């Protein structure tokens, strides 16, 4: 959720990496040094708007992401070029309704996203309700587009057992088609995380994840293709004042206890909208952090600051990136030690 406050071979490679991350030889390796997050494509993909939730094609050469302001949102498309990324354009299936939070299936055959598009043509968007208040015209549901020989299919609304809530956000797709997402707890109004098992081509009834009970806001799940781990945003301790990122692993006994990703990944303000690169080497997330400055400064430094602020560094969500492997190694080791 945003500001609420080649093919199968590559998918198989990603699954193999997931398995390798849990192997004894991997766990025994020397932990790589964790590096600080860096801004992703500043001024192009991370721009002056509220940018979040990158979804990459399996080859990593095309990215879809959400760009929004308080009353409008669209899914954007950009392609890798020699010196970075192309100027984003509105994705072919977006632009008529408020669309956000695309999530690519690991094999690239379809994409699920959030939209206020009404279920019936001709209707107006309904009202959403979460965090104890109504949001007129901001009902949301999960929709899907499928890859065709000519691009993307027309949007299809996911079935009603998925879209019962008027405020459903942040889809993420596992390799077997199972779907994770967030929706409000019916008693507290806080967002909690759900999973719907895909079985025989159909979604089963969504079930809340055992570590997410609605006591506080849990948002934006990003699940590994093999469902061995999940990264999400939460207001749980120690993130009581802002949204921070947590990781949780699944072992033989099920899901473990969520672990805070620390103050190298998490900044002083909100960090959420986690996404995983197709090769599972990079964690992407959206953050309100800004580039720190010191004083005194030269006029040249200030001019550079103002140029950067106009391009992207303005306290809105931008997309940041950090190596994923060191994080998984560190926190999986702590999970295994418990």
Language-model features: where?
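Short, conserved micro-motifs composed of acidic
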Residues: 27-338
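Bacterial N-terminal signal peptides that target proteins for export
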Residues: 2-13
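Low-complexity, intrinsically disordered segments with a bias for serine/threonine
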Residues: 7, 16, 26-29
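Bacterial N-terminal signal peptides
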Residues: 11-23
């Amino acid at each position: 959720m945003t500001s609420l406050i080649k093919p199968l071979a590559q998918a198989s490679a990603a699954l193999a990496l997931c398995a390798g991350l849990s192997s004894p030889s991997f766990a025994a390796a020397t932990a790589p040094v964790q590096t600080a997050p860096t801004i992703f494509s500043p001024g192009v993909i991370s721009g002056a708007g509220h940018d979040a939730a990158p979804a990459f094609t399996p080859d990593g050469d095309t990215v879809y992401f959400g760009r929004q302001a308080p009353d409008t949102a669209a899914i954007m498309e950009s392609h890798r070029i020699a010196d970075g990324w192309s100027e984003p354009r509105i994705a072919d299936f977006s632009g008529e309704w408020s669309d956000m939070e695309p999530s690519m299936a690991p094999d690239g055959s379809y994409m699920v996203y959030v939209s206020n598009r009404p279920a019936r043509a001709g209707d107006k968007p309904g009202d959403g309700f979460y965090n104890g208040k109504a949001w007129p015209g901001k009902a949301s549901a999960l929709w899907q587009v499928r890859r065709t020989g000519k691009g993307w299919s027309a949007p299809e609304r996911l079935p009603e057992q998925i879209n019962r809530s008027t405020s459903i956000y942040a889809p993420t797709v596992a390799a077997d088609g199972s779907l994770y997402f967030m929706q409000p707890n019916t008693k507290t109004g806080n967002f909690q995380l759900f999973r719907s098992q895909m079985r025989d081509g159909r979604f089963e009834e969504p079930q809340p994840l055992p570590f997410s009970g609605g006591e506080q806001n849990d948002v934006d799940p990003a699940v590994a293709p093999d469902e061995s781990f999940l990264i999400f945003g939460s207001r749980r301790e120690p993130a009581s004042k802002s949204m921070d990122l947590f990781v949780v692993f699944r072992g033989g006994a099920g899901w473990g206890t969520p672990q805070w990703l620390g103050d190298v990944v998490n900044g002083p303000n909100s960090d959420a909208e986690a996404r995983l690169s197709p090769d599972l080497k990079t964690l992407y997330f959206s953050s309100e952090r800004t580039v720190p400055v010191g004083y005194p400064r030269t006029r040249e430094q200030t001019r550079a600051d103002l140029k950067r602020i106009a391009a992207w560094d303005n306290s809105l969500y931008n997309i940041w990136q950090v190596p994923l492997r060191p994080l998984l190694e560190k926190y999986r080791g702590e999970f295994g030690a418990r």
